[in-house]
């Protein structure tokens, strides 16, 4: 079948299965649930992973759509049930209506295709789509990734979701859009120069927005928009190198972004704030935690030999043979991505903290010293990250 050929080309089937197993093991072993209903929490996570596994392995496009949309339900329950702030309700509305309304054209296309060909398998889709239908079909995937101008729901959902919801959303749920875009794009070769321009300029604007953020979690959320712009751009170029670049970027972003969300939660659990004004000079209190923060920031900005580095290398190899303008704007996007990664690390780990915050930090340090008995605060942080 076509889907299995596509997955075997880049070993996606095994990679997705291992990624799901790794994240399920990580979530159930490293995160201690403090809610009143841990059984309900675990049930929601298990149901979410089952839906994701079914989405990535089904051959029928209509089943892919059903599982694709059903994965929204556990995520919204996580945001509503275990979010931190009252704003989680409008964030859930944004998440639901953006993703649901954008997927309606895809549903109508699937129904029309099934009525014409009496099949919803992917190998028949190549003869069915023209350019306009192709754009309507990928709209749902573009919003899910998301593309700039349809990204409003992502920062709201990330900021209001619990740490587990943010990690799963960044690591796997956003990749559903990239996976669907890849499956449709390899069947229909259309060079969408306008959409490519939107991705490039949207990625640059997202990087500039990141440099103006004062909330750690919000910055990480907007960085996802910038990285996903690279993914969409690579898919739309319809080149072997750029397709490989997009796949590597999605895997790398899933690891780095979820790790950064987890570390931001550890900061929040210690100082009860995500503001850059209150998270300065953290390296003096939590050096091991800042070491992992630095490592993930370097991986996120594409230093060799990270996956991001090889992803960008494949992208520029493919882009050089297509359009020099794309190469120039993509270089600016890579530079700005490095800038906000450096800003993210330096604003939290270094700098001069507020005087009153130093007093609070001393009290927090004493609390964690008592909590870890004879162990130091840094050893306690290191054990959490292992």
From Swiss-Prot:
GO cellular component: mitochondrial membrane
GO terms under biological process: ATP synthesis coupled electron transport; electron transport coupled proton transport
Sorted UniProt keywords: Electron transport, Membrane, Mitochondrion, NAD, Respiratory chain, Translocase, Transmembrane, Transmembrane helix, Transport, Ubiquinone
GO molecular function, one term: NADH dehydrogenase (ubiquinone) activity
Membrane is among the record's keywords: yes
Entry EC number(s): 7.1.1.2
Reaction(s) catalysed by this chain's protein: a ubiquinone + NADH + 5 H(+)(in) = a ubiquinol + NAD(+) + 4 H(+)(out)
Record's subcellular location: Mitochondrion membrane
Signal peptide: none
Keyword Membrane assigned: yes
Pfam families: Proton_antipo_M (PF00361)
Topology class, membrane: Multi-pass membrane protein
Regions that span the bilayer: 8-28, 37-57, 61-81, 91-111, 133-153, 167-187, 189-209, 219-239, 247-267, 283-303, 315-335
The protein's role, per its UniProt record: Core subunit of the mitochondrial membrane respiratory chain NADH dehydrogenase (Complex I) that is believed to belong to the minimal assembly required for catalysis. Complex I functions in the transfer of electrons from NADH to the respiratory chain. The immediate electron acceptor for the enzyme is believed to be ubiquinone.
Family the UniProt entry places it in: Belongs to the complex I subunit 4 family.
Protein name per UniProt: NADH-ubiquinone oxidoreductase chain 4
